[in-house]
Curated annotation (Swiss-Prot):
Pathway noted in the entry: Porphyrin-containing compound metabolism; protoporphyrin-IX biosynthesis; coproporphyrinogen-III from 5-aminolevulinate: step 2/4
The keyword Transferase is annotated on this UniProt entry: yes
Functional note: Tetrapolymerization of the monopyrrole PBG into the hydroxymethylbilane pre-uroporphyrinogen in several discrete steps.
Keywords: Porphyrin biosynthesis, Transferase
Protein name: Porphobilinogen deaminase
Family: Belongs to the HMBS family.
GO cellular component: cytoplasm
One Pfam family here: Porphobil_deam
Amino acid sequence: MNFIIATRRSKLAQVQTEIIIDLLNKKHDIECEKLLIETVGDKILEVSLDKIGGKGLFVKDIEVAMLEQRADAAVHSMKDVPYEMPKGFEIIAIPKREDVRDAFISLDNIKFKDLRKGAKIGTSSRRRAAQLKLLRPDLDIVPIRGNVQTRIEKIKKENLDGIILAVAGLKRVNLEHLITDYFDTKEMVPAIGQGALGIEVMEEHPKKELFKDLDHYNSKICVLAERAFMRELDGDCHSTIGAYASIKDNIMHIIGIFERKNKIIKKEITGTKDQYEKLGIALAEHILKD
């Protein structure tokens, strides 16, 4: 049996797809090949995502490949997947999640707490920018886009003091050694789905159950809780929004942030993990009442 897996052309996207291909091969002895697609989001790099349609721009062209039966499945970073799936598509599996934290990479290995006043920090994320300003109001936030390597190179090219990237992506492309600091999830609440990969299929695909075997239940329900939070707040990359759900002894804890009326609101909630979707919705409702 031979499967074709669609993904973006970036090194990180290809590495993430190879992780899924390796899992499939070990589980079912299935041969897979990648279909590399340059998405609209990859082509337009000079404009921030919130001005050109959001993170869904990384997904739509890949879904077209499945619709045209050029691919059997797609691998996405779950933080790039809009909460509303197009009709006929589904996220069939979310394998075990990687590190969810954000990382700080500085020019000369200077710790975040030791940055000079007015230091220039590169990030294209509204979520990261807002939380950086809460931690250090003096910082100068500079918008940057591009793949992991391009952003790292921009530290020198654009005379930045540092940049913020997801730990998971750096680990997957073997660049974790460049990390100067790790942000705690309470001081820098991650993006919804950060660190998680999702396998997307057409609902009618005859072999979709083979992908389901790659699902990691606790990882999946944590991501689904975060996405329920996002859906309730109608959040996207136009929003300053973040959430992180974790499980210990069957108890789920979710921390979430959302900008409302020009104010960053941060709330937490705890409950049994079988109520994961209700917890995400309840956390959003708490924020809306603030």
